[in-house]
C-alpha cells in the first residue's frame, strides 16, 4: 500500500479549513465590521505586536495606488482559493470599498507598488512587498507530539521533496550528495531528471527519525522549515534568500538552524561538528522551538494580521474609509 504523503496528525485539517472558510463568506462582511472594535480594540500595546507589524509592512510614507482592486472584488482574482480565504479571514473586518494590490502565489520579486504577497526577497528595499499569512494550510504546520529526542535519532541528514528542472540549486544538492553515507535524500516527483534520485516518500514521522533535515528553498521559501523548527531535529540550509510571515530573514545561523555554504561544500563538516558537539545542537533545538512559539498564539496572529492590513490602508491614503 502506498505510503501516505504526510503524517496527518501533524497536518492541518483540510476539510475543516474549507468548511470554516465557506461559512465565513456566507455571512455579510458588515456583520464582521460591527464586531471589529470588540475583537481588536486597544490591543496594539501587547508586547512585540507592533514590531512584527512593522516588519511585515515596512511602508513609511503615504503612497497613492495605481489601479488598485476593491476588497469586494478580491474573489475575482485568478489563483488559489486558499489565498482568498486567508485574506478574507481578516479583510472581512474592513470596509469592502477599501482598495489594494494583491499577488497570489510564490513571489520572488518586489512589486513596483505596495502589494500584499505571501513571499518576498530578503533585502533592505523590499518595502513594496507587504507580507500576509497566506497559504497557511500548507506552510504553517507544526509538530504536535514527538516521541524521540535528538540524541536518540540517526546521525544523518534526510530530505524528501520535489526537484524540478527549474531548480538548479536543488539539482546541485542531489548531484553532490545522493548516495552520500551521511545522507538519505531523494526526490519524490517524476520528471526527466536522473531516475536514480526517485525514491519512496517518507512521512513526517519517518523523517523525524533523523537528527538533521534539509530545508532547501524551492520556488521561494522552504515549506518544511516551520515544522522542522518545531521538532527535536535541526534544520540544515544555506542562509535563506526569501521570507514569508515566518520572518525567515530574522533567523540567525547556528542559533536557529545549521547554516551551510551556498555551494553545499561544507555539509559533511557541519554535520560532523554538531554530532560531536551535541550540547550546541541541543541549544539550536531549544532556540528554534522558542522561535516557533510566537506563531502558535492564534489571537496574537489575528491581531497582527489585522494591524498589518490596517497600516497598509493608512499608508495608501485610505484612512477615511477605515
How should these model regions be labeled?
Residues 205-322:
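Catalytic binding pocket for nucleotide-activated donors in carbohydrate/polymer assembly enzymes
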Amino acid at each position: 500500500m502506498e505510503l501516505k504523503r504526510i503524517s496527518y496528525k501533524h497536518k492541518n485539517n483540510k476539510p475543516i479549513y474549507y468548511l470554516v472558510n465557506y461559512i465565513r463568506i456566507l455571512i455579510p462582511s458588515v456583520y464582521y465590521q460591527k464586531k471589529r472594535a470588540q475583537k481588536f480594540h486597544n490591543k496594539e500595546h501587547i508586547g512585540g505586536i507592533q514590531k512584527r507589524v512593522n516588519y511585515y509592512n515596512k511602508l513609511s510614507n503615504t503612497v497613492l495606488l495605481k489601479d488598485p482592486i476593491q476588497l469586494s472584488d478580491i474573489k475575482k482574482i485568478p489563483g488559489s482559493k486558499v489565498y482568498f480565504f486567508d485574506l478574507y479571514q481578516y479583510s472581512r473586518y474592513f470596509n469592502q470599498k477599501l482598495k489594494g494590490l494583491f499577488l497570489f502565489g510564490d513571489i520572488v520579486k518586489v512589486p513596483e507598488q505596495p502589494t500584499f504577497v505571501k513571499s518576498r526577497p530578503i533585502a533592505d528595499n523590499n518595502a513594496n512587498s507587504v507580507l500576509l499569512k497566506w497559504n497557511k494550510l500548507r506552510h504553517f504546520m507544526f509538530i504536535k507530539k514527538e516521541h524521540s529526542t535528538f540524541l536518540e535519532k540517526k546521525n544523518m541528514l534526510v530530505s524528501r521533496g520535489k526537484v524540478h528542472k527549474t531548480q538548479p540549486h536543488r539539482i546541485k544538492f542531489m548531484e553532490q550528495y545522493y548516495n552520500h553515507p551521511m545522507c538519505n535524500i531523494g526526490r519524490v516527483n517524476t520528471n526527466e531528471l536522473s531516475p536514480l534520485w526517485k525514491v519512496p516518500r517518507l512521512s513526517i514521522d519517518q523523517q523525524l527519525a533523523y537528527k538533521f533535515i534539509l530545508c532547501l528553498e524551492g520556488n521561494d521559501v522552504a515549506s518544511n522549515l516551520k515544522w522542522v523548527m518545531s521538532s527535536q531535529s535541526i534544520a540544515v540550509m544555506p542562509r535563506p534568500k526569501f521570507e514569508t510571515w515566518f520572518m525567515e530573514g530574522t533567523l540567525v545561523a547556528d542559533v536557529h538552524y545549521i547554516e551551510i555554504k551556498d555551494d553545499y561544500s561544507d555539509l559533511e563538516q557541519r554535520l560532523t561538528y554538531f554530532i560531536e558537539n551535541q550540547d550546541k545542537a541541543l541549544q539550536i533545538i531549544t532556540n528554534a522551538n522558542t522561535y516557533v512559539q510566537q506563531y502558535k498564539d492564534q489571537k496574537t496572529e489575528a491581531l497582527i494580521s489585522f494591524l498589518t492590513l490596517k497600516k497598509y490602508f493608512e499608508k495608501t491614503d485610505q484612512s477615511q474609509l477605515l
